[in-house]
């Protein structure tokens, strides 16, 4: 006789960081409630939850929305413990937010959570105008992903509901990734 055992969803904590007004909260609300918030309300801290299936496994995501404003620099790191993955966000329409990925956010999350995987997220994809120097290009995003050793880059639009599912699937995959074996030779002590 075999028992039919159903695995319960694996809980994961995903913490979202980035400059204020890059669209972190809109991304979370649109993803979890399937509605785009038209009004901007600055976030101090907020939590959202949802279930997701990735690669034939169920997960329960707790999504921690953090404040990007400098006023909350001392409070924000209190949300970092037990994080399984960071979504490091910048707005495709803001070069300053993109530059802050490397100068502010990457150093901050590495200081508090050195080995937690990161998915780099370019928000407000719907605003990009091709061949405009004002906007961050996909190539620049890919280069930044390599420089900060992020698991992946996903560009999305909360307003158009474009690539939102992929953002959270990649966060789960970043947590579940297996270390790559570079050599099959064993260590020998002589």
Swiss-Prot record:
Cross-referenced NCBIfam families: small_GTP
Residues spanned by motif Effector region: 40-48
Superkingdom of origin: Eukaryota
Chief place where the protein resides: membrane
Protein name stated in the entry: Ras-like GTP-binding protein RhoL
Annotated source species: Drosophila melanogaster
Coiled coil: none
Listed GO MF terms: GTP binding; GTPase activity; protein kinase binding
InterPro entries: P-loop_NTPase, Small_GTP-bd, Small_GTPase, Small_GTPase_Rho
Propeptide: 188-190
UniProt-listed Pfam families: Ras (PF00071)
Recorded GO CC terms: cell projection; cytoplasmic vesicle; cytoskeleton; plasma membrane
């Amino acid at each position: 006789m075999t028992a039919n055992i159903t695995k319960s969803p694996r809980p994961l904590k995903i913490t979202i960081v980035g400059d204020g007004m890059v669209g972190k909260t809109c991304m979370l609300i649109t993803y979890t409630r399937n509605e785009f918030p038209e009004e901007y309300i600055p976030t101090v801290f907020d939590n959202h939850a949802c279930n997701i299936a990735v690669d034939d496994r169920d997960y329960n995501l707790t999504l921690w929305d953090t404040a990007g404003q400098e006023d909350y620099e001392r409070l924000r790191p209190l949300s970092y413990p037990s994080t399984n993955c960071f979504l490091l966000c910048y707005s495709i329409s803001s070069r300053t937010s993109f530059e802050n990925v490397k100068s502010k956010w990457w150093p901050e999350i590495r200081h508090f959570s050195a080995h937690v995987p990161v998915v780099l997220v370019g928000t407000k994809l719907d605003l990009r105008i091709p061949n405009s120097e004002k906007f961050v290009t996909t190539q620049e995003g890919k280069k930044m992903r390599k420089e900060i050793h992020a698991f992946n880059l996903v560009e999305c639009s909360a307003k158009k509901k474009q690539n939102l599912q992929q953002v959270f699937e990649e966060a789960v995959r970043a947590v579940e990734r297996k270390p790559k074996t570079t050599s099959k030779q064993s260590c020998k002590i002589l």
